[in-house]
């Protein structure tokens, strides 16, 4: 199981010991998209969804998702997050909504999982609030776009054209 930090020498899952690591500023940015019917997109854009302010509720859900990541992902460390910024971008061409989340902490381990969880929970909330009018929505392209800090240094995803 060489290279997989969540397994010990015997192949058993364990939480990685980060006690000896240096505390640094950690930042992760993740992104994802939900595609939908034009009529569903219009309801969100125009603020006319039956359940209320879809993106406002999804923003709060995404923040809560980042904060609760360690409760959902068994081997994640509980972290004291210093910032969770959630942005939704309406995309007429899809039609759909992009969710971009930046998570920050000052600690011994990264916040990539918190950023990914926040994106997923935000997009799942959009789905939940609109499923009565569009059960065919698709959540797609969820990924870490950038991470900063820590021993491994900074990393940025390269967009690969079709």
Swiss-Prot record:
CDD domains on file = MoaC_PE (cd01420)
> What's its catalytic activity?
(8S)-3',8-cyclo-7,8-dihydroguanosine 5'-triphosphate = cyclic pyranopterin phosphate + diphosphate
Q: Which UniProt keywords apply?
A: Lyase, Molybdenum cofactor biosynthesis
- Pfam families documented for this protein: MoaC
One of the GO biological process terms: Mo-molybdopterin cofactor biosynthetic process
Q: Does the keyword Hydrolase apply?
A: no
Record's keyword annotation contains Metal-binding:
no
Pathway-wise, it operates in:
Cofactor biosynthesis; molybdopterin biosynthesis
Catalytic residues, chain numbering: 128
Q: How does it assemble?
A: Homohexamer; trimer of dimers.
Q: Which PANTHER family does this UniProt record tie to the protein?
A: CYCLIC PYRANOPTERIN MONOPHOSPHATE SYNTHASE, MOLYBDOPTERIN COFACTOR SYNTHESIS PROTEIN A
Please state which protein family the record places this protein in: Belongs to the MoaC family.
What is this protein identified as? Cyclic pyranopterin monophosphate synthase
Provide the organism lineage as a comma list: Bacteria, Pseudomonadati, Pseudomonadota, Betaproteobacteria, Burkholderiales
Which gene is annotated as encoding this protein in its UniProt record? Answer: moaC
């Amino acid at each position: 199981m060489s290279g997989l930090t969540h397994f010990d020498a015997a192949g058993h899952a364990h939480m990685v010991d980060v006690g000896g690591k240096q505390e640094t500023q950690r930042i992760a940015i993740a992104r994802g998209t939900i595609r939908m019917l034009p009529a569903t997109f219009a309801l969100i854009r125009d603020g006319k969804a039956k359940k209320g302010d879809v993106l406002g509720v999804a923003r709060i859900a995404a923040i809560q998702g980042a904060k609760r990541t360690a409760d959902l992902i068994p081997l994640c460390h509980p972290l004291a997050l210093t910032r969770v910024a959630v942005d939704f971008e309406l995309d007429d061409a899809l039609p759909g909504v992009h969710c971009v989340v930046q998570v920050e902490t000052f600690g011994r381990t990264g916040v990539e999982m918190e950023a990914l969880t926040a994106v997923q929970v935000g997009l799942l909330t959009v789905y939940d609030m609109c499923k009565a009018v569009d059960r065919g929505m698709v959540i797609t392209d969820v990924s870490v776009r950038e991470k900063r800090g820590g021993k491994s240094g900074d990393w940025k995803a390269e967009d690969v054209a079709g």
